Amino acid sequence: MSMLCYTLIIAFLIGIWAAPQSEDNVPLGSPATSDLSDTSCAQTHEDLKTSRNTDQRHPAPKKADDQELGSAANIIVDPKLFQKRQFQSSRVLFSTQPPPLSRDEQSVEFLDNEDALNRNIQAKRQNHPVHDLGEHSVCDSISEWVTKTTATDIKGNTVTVKVDVNLNNHVYKQYFFETKCRNPNPVPSGCRGIDSRLWTSYCTKTQTFVRALTMEGNQASWRFIRIDTACVCVITKKTDNL
């Protein structure tokens, strides 16, 4: 009986000694540990490489301040914005070069170099002054297309006018057709054709409001601004004749 017990104990001890050791109990310098270390290093290197490539493909988003500065320097306008009738005016024009001196009754339009050149030629043919009819204006006026950097809006505030507009990858300038007085006193007595014995007269400009593309912060917006549109004669009755 005792021999049987000894035999079972010895067999049990031999089985424990012959069982493979687990990786958790492997000494630090064993081949199993080296394989795990190499695998971890390779995986870490691969993760770093993947992360670097990901950063290159998807750079970190820029700061909001940088984005605002970039948008302010190069504002792109949607062409559909100009198709709305309430934004159209015959005195506002967007063109790549200075438009002709004549003003037609068309709405907001965009001219390329060829169209503007053709209209310049037509303007020279159609706008010759007529001197043989004996007709004279009470006040002498001058009309021209101009650009503006600032203007007064309908609320009386000074606003920044957008000069250059990026539209379909082309830069257009915003022009305004203004009419001003050439001289406040076309004749020594004031307005032409006014009886200076009874009236005191002088020429002055009048203004109206048109929709223009302006800057509000870093965004472009439409506003009513004031421009010169006519030259009229102002008369007052002399008090000596009352």
Curated annotation (Swiss-Prot):
Annotated protein name in UniProt: Venom nerve growth factor 2
Region (Disordered): 47-70
Classification via SMART domains: NGF (SM00140)
GO molecular function: growth factor activity; lipid binding; metalloendopeptidase inhibitor activity; nerve growth factor receptor binding; toxin activity
GO cellular component: axon; dendrite; extracellular space; synaptic vesicle
Similarity-based family: Belongs to the NGF-beta family.
Subunit (UniProt): Homodimer; non-covalently linked.
Basic and acidic residues bias spans: 47-66
Signal sequence bounds: 1-18
A Pfam family hit: NGF
Transmembrane segments: none
Disulfide bond residue pairs: 139-203, 181-231, 191-233
Propeptide intervals in chain numbering: 19-125
InterPro entries noted in UniProt: Cystine-knot_cytokine, Nerve_growth_factor-like, Nerve_growth_factor-rel, Nerve_growth_factor_bsu, Nerve_growth_factor_CS, Venom_nerve_growth_factor
UniProt keyword terms in alphabetical order: Cleavage on pair of basic residues, Disulfide bond, Growth factor, Lipid-binding, Metalloenzyme inhibitor, Metalloprotease inhibitor, Protease inhibitor, Secreted, Signal, Toxin
Cross-referenced PANTHER family: BETA-NERVE GROWTH FACTOR (PTHR11589:SF10), NERVE GROWTH FACTOR NGF -RELATED (PTHR11589)
Biological processes, Gene Ontology terms: cell surface receptor protein tyrosine kinase signaling pathway; modulation of chemical synaptic transmission; negative regulation of neuron apoptotic process; nerve development; nerve growth factor signaling pathway; neuron projection morphogenesis
Expressed in which tissues: Expressed by the venom gland.
